[in-house]
């Protein structure tokens, strides 16, 4: 892989992926929760700035993303951001090559590319305001195409999407989209509960494994069976989630009862 690009949360994934440490990437996503996404800053409330804070997200960047290592090891990482006009509406997509910027500016670019309207404040970079790159280009192919790249792996979040490749007729594309719907903005994009994260991780792994035989190393028989295999994988995931939920529920009950017994024992110790 010679270059990578991303928009919105895909920009964060691009940075994590370029660290070439899958365990680190897995840990980062396990740590992100609803408090990370919906972080409330009392100072912002006092100033009547009705947005969620980005402090928790910045802390995640600091913990898991080594800006200097990425710049040294992986030069061509592009992030799309949406420039706002005077009425604060997105008017122009910009593609930023992160190697060209210092660490502080890279953080701003990542915050801008993940700044969803209504939820987060627009981010100012060089005197201009920017928001989520996905508003204008959620699959930033163009900057890599301009580098001369003609073979692409496109990973998206919309189930059943068919990529429009009319702008890049001389390029080849392998696309991987979810085999099942991930939900809308509220119950999908912004859902970082443990169960939702676990479902997306498991579905992504299953979809990627099937893609190896349907797109990277095509097997005609496997391709014909793919819809059935996808449904079987989905059923397996839902069963595993139910098992995990049952186990965690039982574990919590046992721990709660042990705590009660310990408290009772302590009372008798003092008699």
Outline where the language-model segments fall.
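Patatin-like phospholipase
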Residues: 1-7, 15-271
């Amino acid at each position: 892989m010679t270059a990578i690009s991303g928009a919105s949360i895909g920009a964060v994934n691009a940075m994590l992926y370029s660290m070439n440490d899958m365990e680190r990437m897995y840990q980062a996503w396990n740590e992100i929760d609803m408090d990370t996404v919906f972080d409330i800053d009392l100072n912002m409330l006092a100033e009547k700035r009705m947005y969620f804070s980005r402090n928790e997200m910045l802390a995640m960047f600091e913990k898991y993303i080594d800006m200097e290592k990425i710049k040294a090891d992986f030069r061509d990482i592009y992030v799309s951001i949406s420039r706002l006009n005077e009425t604060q509406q997105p008017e122009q997509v910009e593609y930023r090559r992160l190697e060209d910027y210092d660490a502080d500016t890279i953080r701003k670019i990542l915050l801008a590319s993940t700044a969803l309207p209504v939820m987060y404040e627009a981010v100012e970079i060089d005197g201009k305001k920017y928001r989520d790159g996905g508003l204008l280009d959620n699959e930033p192919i163009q900057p890599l195409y301009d580098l001369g790249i003609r073979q692409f792996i496109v990973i998206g979040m919309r189930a059943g999407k068919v990529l429009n490749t009319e702008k890049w007729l001389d390029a080849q594309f392998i696309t991987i989209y979810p085999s099942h719907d991930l939900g809308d903005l509220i119950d999908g994009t912004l859902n970082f509960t443990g169960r939702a994260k676990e479902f997306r991780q498991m579905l992504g792994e299953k979809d990627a494994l099937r893609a190896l035989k349907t797109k990277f190393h095509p097997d005609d028989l496997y391709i014909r069976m793919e819809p059935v295999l996808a449904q079987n994988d989905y059923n397996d995931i839902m069963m595993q989630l139910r098992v995990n939920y049952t186990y965690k529920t039982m574990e919590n009950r046992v721990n709660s009862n042990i705590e009660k017994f310990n408290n009772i024992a302590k009372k008798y110790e003092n008699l």
